């Protein structure tokens, strides 16, 4: 049996590794757009910006690993066509590779800013190692920076730039940072944190143009006509899923490649995982597409188990993290639609959690410097343990003890949830 994986990011890499760890003995071909071995992306906006770039430190495995595990790594040669009838993919150099099963792990790409000046030298995006190296070099030679977009990437870049002593202005179209992902309380905490560290936060502000001087980016003009001068500009306004290959071959797409709870497309010989996959979540209307290492890894492991004989649907509690200054933000669950937000701890102390409810149902938890709350939240969400807003607010209420008691009184249900988690979390 031959398995071809399109995309050598976290999801594609993990699929290849997990297939071997599950005993798959057939042919594995991992095809990636970028040159070199698969590498980690999260450090690019974190530790990588704080030190001299060392691409080797990002590698998920050294090149020899792929030879040792009989994984054919095809780098820097994008797939341009999928022939579903012939079950083969065609690369940009006209090479054809046949498959018995195809895994689409095509990921996502930067959303481009559609304004004049967006293509000027000195305008940076941040998703690849090459882009991180370019940004790091630029930050070393400039004294001021404008960051367009107050999402996770934008704010992590802003924090790194402030630590390097740059004057930083963040321009965000919405009225609060990380608004699509976080509660208003948590957004407010990070807005204050950045302001206290010297970042100029320009919220509810759009960008009209990126300005030029001597042929390079020199700042921006806002929609209200304000001119903000800077030596470089970083654009972090989200990503777009890479769904074109799937769409061209007739697979359904809907802000992602549409898959079922088993990560299968309507073509039984093609699956999709990671940032490019739109999949159903029980109890949530429509499809969800998540951009996280956890989702990429867990989906890859779940699919590898299926392809080697263990039939199981994908279920895993989503979790995310971000590091900004002294604050480590950890999120569990999906909190969109929450109508009640309960603070556990003290926001002013910088050590607290926000439990997000819809009625009496816990949707998710946002934690700052409280890893125990984060781990408890993942267990509560995985086992659907009842928790009231009053209990969440009470710091004397022992979450760990409540989880243990729930486990003892619901052994069969918890065991089933634990098995599902292990199937997607354990390597």
Swiss-Prot record:
Keyword Flavoprotein assigned: yes
Keywords: FAD, Flavoprotein, NAD, Oxidoreductase
Gene: thcD
Binding, NAD(+): 144-172
Record-given protein name: Rhodocoxin reductase
TM annotation in the entry: none
Binding sites annotated in the UniProt record for FAD: 2-34
Co-factor requirement: FAD
Cysteine pairs bridged by disulfides in the record: none
Function: The degradation of the thiocarbamate herbicide EPTC by cytochrome CYP116 (thcB) requires the participation of a flavoprotein, rhodocoxin reductase, and an iron-sulfur protein, rhodocoxin, to mediate the transfer of electrons from NADH to P450 for oxygen activation.
Keyword Oxidoreductase set for record: yes
Listed EC numbers: 1.18.1.-
Lineage, opening ranks: Bacteria, Bacillati, Actinomycetota, Actinomycetes, Mycobacteriales
Record-stated family: Belongs to the FAD-dependent oxidoreductase family.
Domain of life from the UniProt record: Bacteria
Pfam families linked: Pyr_redox_2, Reductase_C
InterPro entries recorded: FAD-oxidoreductase/Apoptosis (IPR050446), FAD/NAD-bd_sf (IPR036188), FAD/NAD-binding_dom (IPR023753), FAD/NAD-linked_Rdtase_dimer_sf (IPR016156), Reductase_C (IPR028202)
GO molecular function: oxidoreductase activity, acting on NAD(P)H
SUPFAM superfamilies linked to this entry: FAD/NAD(P)-binding domain, FAD/NAD-linked reductases, dimerisation (C-terminal) domain
Species whose genome carries this gene: Rhodococcus erythropolis (Arthrobacter picolinophilus)
A GO CC term attached to the entry: cytoplasm
């Amino acid at each position: 049996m031959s398995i071809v994986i399109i995309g050598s990011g976290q999801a594609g890499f993990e699929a290849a590794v997990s297939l071997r760890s599950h005993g798959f003995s057939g042919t594995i071909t991992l095809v990636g757009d970028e040159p070199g071995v698969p590498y980690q992306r999260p450090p690019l906006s974190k530790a990588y910006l704080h030190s001299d770039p060392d691409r080797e430190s990002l590698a998920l495995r050294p090149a020899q690993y792929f030879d040792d595990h009989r994984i054919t790594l095809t780098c820097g040669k994008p797939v341009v066509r999928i022939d579903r009838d012939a079950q083969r993919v065609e690369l940009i150099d006209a090479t054809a590779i046949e498959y018995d099963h195809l895994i689409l792990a095509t990921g996502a790409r930067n959303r481009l800013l559609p304004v004049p000046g967006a293509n000027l030298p000195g305008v940076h995006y941040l998703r690849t190692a090459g882009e991180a190296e370019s940004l790091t070099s630029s930050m070393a030679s400039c004294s001021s920076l404008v960051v367009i977009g107050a999402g996770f990437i934008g704010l992590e870049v802003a924090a790194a730039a402030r630590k390097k002593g740059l004057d930083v202005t963040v321009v965000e179209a919405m009225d609060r940072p990380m608004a699509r992902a976080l509660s208003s309380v948590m957004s407010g905490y990070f807005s204050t944190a950045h302001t206290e560290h010297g970042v100029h936060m320009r919220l509810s502000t759009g960008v009209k143009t990126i300005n030029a001087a001597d042929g390079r980016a020199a700042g921006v003009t806002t929609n209200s006509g304000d001119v903000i001068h800077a030596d470089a500009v970083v654009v972090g306004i989200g990503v777009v899923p890479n769904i074109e290959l799937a769409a061209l071959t007739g697979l359904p797409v809907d802000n992602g490649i549409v898959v079922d709870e088993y990560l299968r497309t309507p073509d039984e010989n093609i699956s999709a995982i990671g940032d490019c996959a739109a999949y159903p979540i029980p109890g949530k209307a429509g499809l969800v597409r998540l951009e996280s290492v956890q989702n990429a890894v867990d989906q890859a492991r779940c699919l590898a188990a299926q392809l080697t004989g263990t039939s199981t649907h994908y279920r895993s509690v989503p979790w995310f993290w971000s590091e900004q200054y002294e604050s480590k933000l950890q999120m569990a669950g999906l909190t969109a639609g929450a109508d009640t937000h309960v603070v556990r701890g003290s926001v002013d102390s910088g050590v607290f959690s926000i439990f997000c409810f819809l009625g009496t149902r816990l949707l998710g938890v946002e934690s700052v410097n409280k890893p125990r709350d984060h781990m408890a939240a993942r267990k509560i969400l995985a086992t659907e343990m009842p928790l009231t807003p009053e209990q969440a607010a009470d710091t004397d209420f022992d979450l760990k003890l409540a989880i243990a008691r729930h486990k003892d009184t619901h052994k069969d249900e918890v065991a089933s949830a634990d098995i599902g988690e292990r199937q997607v979390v354990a390597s």
